[in-house]
Amino acid sequence: YIKENILSTLNLKNKKKPLEKIKILDIGCGGGLLSEPMSRLGAEVIGIDASDKNIKVAKLHAKKNDLHIKYYCTSPENFITKTKFDVILNMEIIEHVEDVNNFLESCSRLLKKKGIMFVATLNKTLKSYLFAIVGAEYILQWLPIGTHEWNKFVKPEDLINILKKYNLKLDSLDGMKFNIIKDEWSVSSDKSINYI
């Protein structure tokens, strides 16, 4: 999904290293789950995360796999760089930040004028509360209790309004659904829980 959208939006050819020379900032990179495949596709990747533990894991994993990814323990609000990025990945991070406006304003300053930013997050609905908090944290215990705060979930229309303030426009809005049997995510028309 991400690769195909980058290729089409930036008019890139699908070659062996299709993201060659593309600068990507992976915000909330965790252990490098998205940074690594982007690097393998040829992108110049910088991953940032507020957790020092995550950054240490990501650095070790990248080194073990001979990937040249730069990782920093910081947030977009505090990230000091002269680099502007072709692509910014904000995957499942918005619902954890204290000030979404400030966070997205900081992201907009890091993005090139014709760049693309992916934002994947949880919708603010009763269904998302039941699935992401009650289901994932309390019943299935996939996540530690307290991982999510429902009041930090963001409705798509609220996200769109915030993005407009920083001259960013929405190109597409897709739902994401998790298949528990196949243990995989897929694009969906249902945006009531997760969307991108």
Predicted regions and their residues:
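Residue-level marker for beta-strand->alpha-helix junctions and adjacent short loops that shape enzyme
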Residues: 124, 178-180
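Short alpha-helix
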Residues: 151-167, 173
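Conserved Class I S-adenosyl-L-methionine-dependent methyltransferase catalytic core
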Residues: 1-5
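General small-molecule cofactor/ligand-binding pocket signal
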Residues: 70-72, 171-174
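Core SAM-dependent methyltransferase catalytic element
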Residues: 185-196
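Conserved SAM-binding loop
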Residues: 7-16, 20-129, 156
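Short, flexible, mixed-charge acidic loops at enzyme active sites
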Residues: 129-138
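Acceptor-substrate binding/catalytic loop of class I
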Residues: 121, 141-158
